Amino acid sequence: MKKCFILLLSVCCIISSCGNLSEKEIEETTSTGVVLVQNQSYYEVVLSNGESLYFSGFDEEGDLTGITTDKDSVELVTNYGTGFFISQEGEIATNFHVVSNTVADKEVNKSINKVISALKKVIVAIYNDYNEKLERAQLAYDYANQSPEISYEDFYKVRDIRDAIQKEMEEYAQYYNSLDDIRASDSEIKYHNEVSIAYNNTFVTNTNDFVSCVITKSDQEHDLAIIQLKDKKTPSDKYVFPIDDEDPLETYSWKDEIEKKIKEDKNSKLFMSSFNLGPKLAITKEGIKSQFNNGNISQKTNDRLMYSIPTLPGSSGSPVVNLQGQLVAINFAGLNGTQNFNYGIRVKHLRNLVNK
């Protein structure tokens, strides 16, 4: 009897020393390793004649937005997601779509004709505007030419203005005609972007408060990417998420099996730290703060995990952990029409990317 009691006591001690964590412990431990990811981007169209055009992106109908011929005036599109540290060398895991072009190459290439068409419309509008200016300038010229009250100096000024407008119109007309000679097949659309991160529990007031990163690895098929701080150093006070060699959803140690029977399955509940809606919800008087939510597994496939953790846009790339704080998935998508059933990419694909 005494031996049984001692054995039971020993088992209880083992379980209590290395079992499941409390929700508070999980949040406090993992939240420092979560970062807000910012992606600022624009597109460049290199035409077959060697000239470049720029635009911000695509609207819901697939049309171009913010088209311009001036690189310095192109409006950057800013999107946000979530990431988390996976090494001491400043490596951060997130979703591919958070840090890269989300439009398929074939769809982008189709847009070259749209670019040319949109540019023609812009040129026509500018040409018509100059035509109205020319009509007014011609009236002023005719008046100056016939009026004895106008000095020769003022007359020449009016003439020069009219001639300058005519020259501009001729150049725009030539440019318009030259667009017909541009071959879409020989033109190219390039995606330009800058990726940066902000640390959880820090103050962010503008883009200068973000730390620049580079994209080092990507897996478009599984929507995963690894970015890295340029100095390749993870701050000492940031939590680094371990990536287990074996899937925690499938692998149970003998201690896990005992806890599963006596207390609770380590995978019975999942937790996620994320930046829902980017900085909109994250900004507080104490700095930006991630949101911590939990839910249950609804479905498992070989590649994905569906769970009931509520999310909003901006949570893409968030770490999903179990009751022991083990990384089991990377959040990437929600079901249409609901925010309470979401999908994550199983951690094995991140492990494969890290080892790539």
Language-model regions: role of each:
Residues 18-96, 179-182, 186-200, 207-216, ...:
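N-terminal activation segment of mature serine protease catalytic domains
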Residues 22-23, 78, 205-208, 214-216, ...:
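Flexible, gly/ser-rich surface segments that form the specificity/activation loops bordering the active-site cleft
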Residues 84-85, 310-331:
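Catalytic nucleophile loop of clan PA
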Residues 1-4, 83:
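Positively charged n-region of N-terminal signal peptides that target proteins for export
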Residues 4-14:
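Sec-dependent N-terminal signal peptides
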Residues 20, 90-104, 137-144, 150, ...:
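Conserved active-site neighborhood of the chymotrypsin/trypsin-like protease fold
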Residues 100-182, 328-356:
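C-terminal cap/linker of serine protease catalytic domains
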Residues 223-228, 304-310:
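Short, solvent-exposed secondary-structure boundary/capping segments
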